[in-house]
């Protein structure tokens, strides 16, 4: 089992897609998180109970922008959300790992440094880039303000922390084609 991690907007999904193109099984915990947050799901009901109707859209789905503003403004609220989501995400990830076929599987875990899942990995692959590159990508990709982008980056493990758990590193500072 290979844990693939990196900071937000570092290029984890792009690198995971390269492996997927080579028929390597990929389990993406961000996708699992989206799946478990379906309308009327137990996780979404617990989030609504904990954070209130302000984080729920008119159609009953999670208002990701409202949730993001809350959790990146206050550490305690981010911890509350993680306590709701992380056990569910990990349970589903381990179920998918057990069902995967092949000599190895890549498990994409953005917050691997902060997660107990790192202990289960045989190797850890960190997708790395400079913080300024992350900021630029995050602002362009998600239309974030520089202030909001910095809050998001600052809420995650530091680059040095991520690199400290790496068995292997992909420098994703340059072009996508170079990494492929």
How should each PLM-predicted stretch be described?
Residues 11, 30, 81, 106, ...:
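Residue-level signal for inorganic ion chemistry
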Residues 101, 119-120, 140-180:
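Small-molecule kinase domains that catalyze NTP-dependent phosphoryl transfer to phosphate-bearing small molecules
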Residues 91-98, 104-140:
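ATP-dependent NMP and nucleoside kinases share a basic, alpha-helical "lid"
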Residues 31-34, 129-132, 154, 176:
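Short, acidic/turn-prone active-site loops that include or flank metal/cofactor-
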Residues 31-103:
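ATP-dependent small-molecule kinase phosphotransfer cores
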Residues 1-24, 29-31:
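Walker A (P-loop) phosphate-binding motif
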Residues 44, 48, 131-136, 146, ...:
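An amphipathic alpha-helix signature
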Residues 25, 31, 123, 167-168:
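Well-ordered beta-strand positions
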């Amino acid at each position: 089992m290979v844990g693939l991690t990196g900071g937000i907007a570092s290029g984890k999904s792009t690198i995971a897609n390269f492996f997927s193109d080579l028929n390597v099984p990929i389990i993406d915990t961000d996708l699992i998180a989206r799946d478990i947050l379906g309308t009327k799901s137990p996780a979404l009901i617990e989030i609504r109970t904990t954070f209130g109707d302000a984080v729920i859209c008119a159609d009953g789905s999670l208002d990701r922008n409202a949730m993001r503003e809350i959790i990146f403004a206050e550490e305690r609220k981010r911890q509350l959300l993680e306590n709701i989501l992380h056990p569910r995400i990990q349970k589903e990830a381990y179920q998918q790992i057990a069902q995967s076929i092949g000599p190895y599987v890549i498990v994409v875990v953005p917050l691997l440094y902060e997660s107990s899942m790192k202990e289960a990995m045989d190797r850890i692959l960190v997708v790395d880039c400079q913080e300024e590159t992350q900021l630029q990508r995050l602002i362009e990709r998600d239309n974030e303000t520089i202030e909001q982008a910095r809050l998001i980056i600052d809420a995650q493990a530091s680059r040095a922390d991520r690199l400290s758990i790496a068995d292997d590193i992909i420098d994703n500072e340059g072009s996508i084609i170079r990494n492929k």
